[in-house]
């Protein structure tokens, strides 16, 4: 269900579509409210958002099944607003034990990061304030990365695009081969492909790659986006 393609008038039992397409009134109004018996939502932690709610309220007789690996939202909103019960839970420790996920080895970099002036928004630190608080430590962090992950394929998460771009430059000065990608990058697909193939050994981003991206060769993740 996208662009000029529609399931209406067809005999398909399953329809795949994005919420961005379905939430449009011009498309939604073509359907009878009882058209779907069941709606399955991937990345279901987004189901509370306005777009999903518009679709779910329109098809209000459908059963709803949500699937997500990250049910805990940063704004602390409860998915119980949409889903009545938890059908199945597969925990992180169990997935590691059964070999589906890599065991995590966490290392804390000893920074005396002052977050006292960082404000709060939607239950978490404000990204703009974090940028200011983190900025003086970027060179020190690059030095620590040279100790811990000089030969690893590394993804770095930062609070803002400008911080991500600045840290990319700092890493390149420090001897890494770093790239940066964000939602506005016209060459995003090319950068991701080059990182996957080994052209870059560090990829910086501002929380862009938190879902919908897979790169099994990554063996180090640096989180420079403090959360509560």
Feature annotation, model-predicted:
Residues 20, 44-46, 210, 227:
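Catalytic acidic motif of RecA-like/P-loop NTPases
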Residues 37, 45-106:
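Post-DEXD/H (motif II) to motif III coupling segment of the RecA-like Helicase ATP-binding lobe
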Residues 5-38, 49-54:
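Conserved helix/coil segment N-terminal to the catalytic DExD/H
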Residues 15-18, 62-69, 202-205:
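Structural recognition of the conserved hydrophobic beta-strand(s) that form the central parallel beta-sheet
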Residues 86-155:
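Conserved interdomain linker/interface between the two RecA-like ATPase lobes of SF2 helicase motors
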Residues 34-37, 201-205, 211-226:
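A short beta-strand element within the Helicase C-terminal
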Residues 153-160, 179-181:
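Conserved RecA-like ASCE P-loop NTPase motor core of nucleic-acid helicases/translocases
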Residues 1-11, 27, 165-169, 176-210:
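Conserved helicase ATPase core of P-loop NTP-dependent helicases/translocases
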């Amino acid at each position: 269900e996208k662009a000029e393609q529609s399931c209406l008038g067809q005999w398909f039992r399953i329809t795949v579509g994005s919420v961005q397409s379905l939430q449009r009134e011009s498309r939604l109004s073509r359907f009878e409210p009882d058209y779907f018996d069941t709606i399955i939502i991937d990345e279901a932690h987004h189901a509370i958002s306005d777009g999903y709610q518009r679709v779910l309220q329109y098809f209000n007789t459908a059963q709803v099944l949500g699937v997500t690996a990250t049910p805990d939202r940063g704004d602390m909103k409860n998915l119980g607003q949409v889903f009545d019960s938890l059908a199945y839970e597969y925990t992180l420790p169990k997935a590691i034990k059964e070999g589906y996920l890599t065991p995590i080895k966490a290392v804390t970099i000893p920074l005396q990061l002052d977050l006292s002036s960082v404000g709060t928004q939607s239950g978490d630190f404000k990204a703009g304030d974090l940028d200011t608080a983190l900025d003086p430590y970027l060179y020190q962090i690059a030095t620590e990365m040279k100790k811990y992950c000089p030969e690893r394929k590394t993804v770095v998460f930062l609070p803002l695009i400008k911080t991500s771009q600045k840290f990319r430059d700092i890493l390149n000065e420090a001897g890494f081969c770093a790239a940066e990608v964000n939602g506005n990058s016209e060459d995003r697909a090319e950068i991701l492909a080059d990182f996957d193939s080994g052209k870059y050994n560090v990829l910086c981003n501002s929380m862009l790659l938190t879902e919908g991206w897979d790169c099994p060769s990554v063996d180090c993740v640096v989180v420079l986006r403090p959360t509560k």
